[in-house]
Regions:
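Feature captures the catalytic ectodomains and active-site-proximal regions of enzymes
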Residues: 1-179
Length: 179
């Protein structure tokens, strides 16, 4: 299994798009991931996909699943590549750590249904199911002693998340693994 580091959505989603080079750009204290110089955030993913193949489309699962069959079919008609983003697990992780486990079960059922739609309605034959990143969860919360306090970064961090910290190039904190 390969994964981009850190294993968070903005890096993982960008890595799944066609590109020659991924870069991180810090603007106004906000870190963005670019594919060949283009933003990979949200609806920009469709633009990046179309740069590689104009007969492509990027869609959200939650949007297409509520559509009628004819509406869905019209969106993908004539397309050579269709990306469908599904975020049941990610959405659950932002609201409750314990809901992630049931969200995994829900996601499997939803993706199985989506494959049925792709095969039966879109006549899809090549289906690739992948994930933008992994996750580690336990039913037991982490002890405070297992966590790194953000205040020890002393203005060195570019971005700090629940599972990662991105530091300025050349930073050498003794409590983090450089990647």
């Amino acid at each position: 299994c390969e994964a981009i580091f850190p294993t968070v959505t903005k890096f993982g989603m960008a890595s799944l798009l066609p590109h020659k080079k991924l870069t991180a750009e810090l603007k106004n204290n906000r870190l963005s991931i670019l594919a060949d110089g283009h933003s990979t955030e949200s609806t920009n993913r469709d633009n990046v996909l179309k740069q590689s193949n104009p007969e492509s489309v990027a869609l959200q699962y939650k949007n297409i699943i509520g559509m009628k069959r004819a509406e869905r079919s019209a969106l993908v008609k004539g397309k050579e590549v269709v990306y469908i983003y599904h975020d049941t697990i990610d959405a659950a992780s932002h609201t409750s750590d314990t809901m992630v486990f049931s969200a995994c079960e829900d996601a499997i059922a939803e993706i199985k249904n989506l494959v049925r739609i792709i095969v039966n309605e879109f006549s899809g034959v090549n289906i690739i199911i992948t994930a933008d990143h992994g996750f580690l969860y336990t039913y037991t919360p982490l002890a405070e002693t297992d966590k790194v306090d953000k205040t020890i970064f002393n203005q060195q961090d570019v971005e700090y998340g629940r599972r990662y910290a991105i530091m300025e190039r050349g930073s050498k904190p003794d409590y983090l693994l450089p990647v």
